[in-house]
């Protein structure tokens, strides 16, 4: 029996020493999640959670089997906040409140923190951070060490990326590390419009379910009103929160109208009343707070201290609700997001078929794909990877069924590794965030955690 074992050094990230809490294979209750997020409030950022440190699972490969092919889908690594207006909105609101004398001492202090954060982020919205590059280099190192024969000599590696720069930079960091390990590798990189049909495909139904006017948004608003109470936070920041409502609406509207991107239509400000605008400000402050973990140079700055543990938990619930309903397997969503992943699943099957049809070592033993959180979430749900596809119909329990920070933190990934013996039998190993995972396929296991490829392929084709 052969063992593939990777020891991962402890790094100063956020998962917590010795806590494999990122795993998606168990269903915690709400109280457990409250405690988990209170212990690590960075997790309240959901998909903003930085790739966690884990001990890689040890794998014992059955005797006589050798690695023959590997394919993967990886989310881009840690980045700055997605949109400039997130920083601009906070700056605009606090500048107005400061001019009108409506900031408490804490509010004035927070304004200075926001100015520093905004200056740090200027020109970088949505961009891969240096931490994001390091995440992908580390994953590449572990991958190459796990199956070194696939990265030996002048092996050909093909890498394909979404056309979005943070994905291209993630691909560059990953493949650069592979070349550092073995300069003889022949690496081909692609970021072309045609590849977007599988790397980042959005069906018409997926667009519809994501619209502001989609019917499920009423449920979302009801949940927000029941969970998000900005009263305490705003009272800590403003001398007269009630008197600031009109200024909030004006400041936010002006932020949207001033952020027209070249060549794009102006984004309309959301139609929100005073209470909703207060909730929006709370959300934006939280968005900025949780993104600090994803960048270098702000280690001595925090905004998470502004929120109570319960506020962090509730803000996370709303982020999680949105991702779960639009992209995973929530009851009533018509599986619109999941079905968009069929193109990527078809791609994974096709590249495996091509590689395995060749005797001996394939022409391209490694096929890498770099894309986005939503598309990985959809793929994992479509495949029914453990912990990633539970169906729940009660919005109050979405958080128990599915947790975005487990399923798709920054740099999340799915790896599929194929092993073949001299008789031509093929076994398959699936890894989610570098941990062994299972699929609901009866009688397909050769022995945990391996699947017979013939049974696995039949199962995957049934999802198309």
Would you name each region that the model predicts?
Residues 20-156, 162-367, 371-464:
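Signature for phosphate-centric chemistry
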Residues 1-24:
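Bacterial Sec-dependent N-terminal signal peptides
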């Amino acid at each position: 029996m052969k063992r593939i074992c990777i020891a991962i050094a402890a790094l100063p990230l956020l998962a917590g020493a010795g806590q494999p809490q990122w795993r998606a294979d168990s269903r915690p209750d709400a109280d457990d999640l409250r405690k988990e997020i209170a212990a690590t409030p960075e997790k309240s950022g959901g998909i903003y959670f930085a790739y966690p440190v884990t001990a890689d699972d040890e794998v014992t490969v059955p005797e006589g089997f050798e690695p023959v092919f590997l394919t993967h889908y990886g989310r881009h690594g840690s980045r700055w906040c997605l949109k400039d207006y997130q920083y601009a909105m906070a700056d605009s609101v606090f500048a107005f409140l400061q001019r009108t004398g409506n900031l408490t001492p804490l509010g004035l202090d927070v304004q200075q923190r926001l100015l520093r954060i905004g200056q740090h982020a200027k020109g970088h919205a949505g961009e891969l951070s240096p931490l994001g590059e390091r995440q992908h280099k580390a994953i590449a190192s572990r991958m190459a060490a796990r199956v070194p024969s696939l990265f030996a000599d002048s092996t050909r590696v093909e890498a394909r990326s979404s056309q979005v720069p943070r994905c291209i930079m993630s691909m560059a960091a990953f493949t650069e590390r592979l070349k550092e390990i073995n300069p003889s590798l022949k690496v081909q990189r692609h970021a072309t419009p045609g590849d977007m049909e599988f790397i980042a495909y959005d069906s018409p139904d997926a667009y519809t379910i994501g619209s502001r006017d989609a019917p499920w948004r009423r449920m979302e608003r009801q949940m927000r009103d029941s969970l998000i109470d900005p009263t305490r936070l705003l009272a800590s920041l403003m001398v007269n929160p009630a008197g600031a409502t009109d200024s909030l609406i004006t400041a936010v509207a002006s932020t949207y109208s001033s952020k027209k991107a070249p060549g794009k239509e102006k984004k309309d400000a959301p139609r929100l009343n005073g209470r909703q605008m207060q909730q929006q400000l709370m959300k934006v402050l939280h968005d900025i707070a949780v993104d600090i973990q994803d960048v270098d140079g702000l280690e001595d700055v925090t905004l998470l201290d502004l929120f109570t543990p319960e506020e962090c938990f509730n803000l996370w619930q709303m982020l999680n609700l949105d991702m779960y309903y639009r992209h995973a397997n929530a009851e009533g969503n018509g599986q619109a997001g999941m079905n968009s992943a069929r193109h990527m699943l078809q791609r994974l099957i096709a590249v495996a078929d091509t590689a395995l049809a060749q005797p001996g070592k394939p022409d391209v033993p490694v096929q890498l794909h770099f894309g986005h959180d939503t598309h990985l979430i959809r793929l994992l749900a479509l495949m029914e990877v453990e912990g990633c596809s539970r169906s729940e119909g009660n919005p109050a329990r979405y958080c128990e069924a599915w947790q975005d920070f487990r399923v798709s933190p920054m740099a999340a990934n799915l790896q599929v590794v194929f092993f073949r013996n001299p008789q031509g039998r093929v076994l398959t190993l699936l890894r989610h965030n570098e941990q062994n995972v299972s699929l609901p396929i009866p009688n397909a296991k050769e022995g945990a955690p391996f699947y017979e490829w013939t049974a696995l392929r039949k199962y995957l084709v049934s999802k198309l």
